[in-house]
Amino acid sequence: MVSVGIVGTGSYVPDKVLTNFDLEQMVDTNDQWIVSRTGIKERHIAAPETPVSELCYQAALRALEDAKLAPEELDLVIVATITPDFVFPATACLVAERLGAKKAAGFDLQAACTGFLYGVATAAQFIATGIYKNALVIGGETLSKILNWEDRGTCILFGDGAGAAVLQPVEEGYGFLGYDLGMDGAGGSLLTMPGGGSMHPASAETVAKKMHTIQMAGSEVFKFAVRIMGETALKALDKAGLGIGDVDCLIPHQANTRIVDAAVKRLGIDAGKVVVNLDRYGNMSAASIPVALDEAARSGRLNYGDIMVMVGFGGGLTWGAAVVKWSKRGV
């Protein structure tokens, strides 16, 4: 099969910044408490009238420009999100229309914080098998719109943003080398938004009970995350015929400093190889990894031939990792 790699990246976050000091005025918390437990100092918040499709569109423009690809050349658009503009139509359809990707197929994919990894793994198969040539994968979220701003256990954690990647055939032996994806529905209730679906359709009661906001069993999710991040990264590396010593760059889901630090320690990887930006953005769910990827690529942390691992976990419960031999050459 054809080797498939990332040939362009882009990201976008809203202008408005919400700091920990701002949160002190909203809920019973303080900057020191938030930083010591999460590592987060600030996050970006979309305006009430701004849908996730706008963030996805802006990230997509930047990724296409980086890849030197015109929108009409796209064959496939995948949007990973838990905060779509609508239940239907898919946000991918809205973004593709605005871009002018007239010949592209497209759909939304929902795997919470693991969504971008599921997205690139899916898109890569369409290209590897020769069905498509150019794919755009976007992870975007407006989590601020589904937060209970009175719940200090969750409202301090999340932010809004979008990241995108363009996938194409690349030279043999480069690009995606291995994946590991998984899920465990038994843990679905640990991280969920219960209202609005066919189980609990929207009603005055579901709104009053704040069922349209993120509900999280923090300690249970923490224990799961620390264990699974290391396991899935090692499995993906094994499938690629590599070990942790071969890794030049690790891009973990930016959920919480303590989770990232614990996973890094378990893996035994040099902390200097790990990309961390959650202090500036918080947890952006499906946007977390692609925004960090874009920053790593643009800052020179990824060089031609580097072995890069993206790894994450999320609601579902879901998890995943992808191993990439970086195929993009510097300008």
Swiss-Prot record:
It comes from the Bacteria. Residues 254-258 are annotated as: ACP-binding. It is an enzyme of class 2 (transferase). It catalyses: malonyl-[ACP] + acetyl-CoA + H(+) = 3-oxobutanoyl-[ACP] + CO2 + CoA. One of its GO terms (molecular function) is 3-oxoacyl-[acyl-carrier-protein] synthase activity. The keyword Acyltransferase applies. Transmembrane segments: none annotated. The active site is at C113, H253, N283. Pfam families: ACP_syn_III, ACP_syn_III_C. The keyword Translocase does not apply. Pathway: Lipid metabolism; fatty acid biosynthesis. Gene3D superfamilies: 3.40.47.10. Its EC number is 2.3.1.180. GO terms for cellular component: cytoplasm. It is found in: Cytoplasm. GO terms for biological process: fatty acid biosynthetic process; secondary metabolite biosynthetic process. Keywords: Acyltransferase, Cytoplasm, Fatty acid biosynthesis, Fatty acid metabolism, Lipid biosynthesis, Lipid metabolism, Multifunctional enzyme, Transferase. Belongs to the thiolase-like superfamily. FabH family. Catalyzes the condensation reaction of fatty acid synthesis by the addition to an acyl acceptor of two carbons from malonyl-ACP. Catalyzes the first condensation reaction which initiates fatty acid synthesis and may therefore play a role in governing the total rate of fatty acid production. Possesses both acetoacetyl-ACP synthase and acetyl transacylase activities. Its substrate specificity determines the biosynthesis of branched-chain and/or straight-chain of fatty acids. HAMAP family: FabH. The last Arg residue of the ACP-binding site is essential for the weak association between ACP/AcpP and FabH. Homodimer. PANTHER family: 3-OXOACYL-[ACYL-CARRIER-PROTEIN] SYNTHASE 3, BETA-KETOACYL-[ACYL-CARRIER-PROTEIN] SYNTHASE III. This is Beta-ketoacyl-[acyl-carrier-protein] synthase III. It comes from Desulfitobacterium hafniense (strain DSM 10664 / DCB-2). The gene is fabH.
